[in-house]
Amino acid sequence: QSGEPAFSATDCILAGTQKALKQVDAIDPNRLGLIGHSFGGFETGFTITQTDLFATAVAGSGIYDNASFYLYIQDEGDPAYFQYEENQLRIPQNLFLDYQGYLDNSALYHTSTMNTPLLLWSGKDDHHVDFNQTLDFYMGLKRLQKPVTMLLYAGMHHSAYKHFQQIDLCLKVEHWLDHYLKGVPAESWVK
């Protein structure tokens, strides 16, 4: 829905999950995980502030504070506001005309309602979505003593292009999901 990208995404995710739970008996409703990267990270981060349906979540390189990201200059030198007004994030009014709408659709400002264990990750050299989006969300969650772990990768851009980064991230995400969905004991980096 235009003007409410985070709430619309949450509605879609929850509707799809509920439909899958009704149609597939093999799905354990107590062992659901949610994972997303980039726009999917934005969706994942926000969704778990609105529901406790998921046992765990993983969000990579997402936008968690729309107000601060709006004026960010991305890799190609373009301001991020085009993504809101004309693209994926679908908030047609600019930040200065709909400030509250930008805050309402930001996971950062809903951290107090988040209970789902969350693994955040980002590349320190991400110039598409600044890694400070991840860092700020992490710090907000830590300040409220929420269950969160953050991985920051030096030399990584918006995605894991280097093989060793892909391997490390893949193994850590797999372990995170194994721990929270299958009860595998946590490795030291999880705590």
Give a label for each model feature:
Residues 1-191:
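Active-site-proximal cap/loop segments of hydrolase catalytic domains
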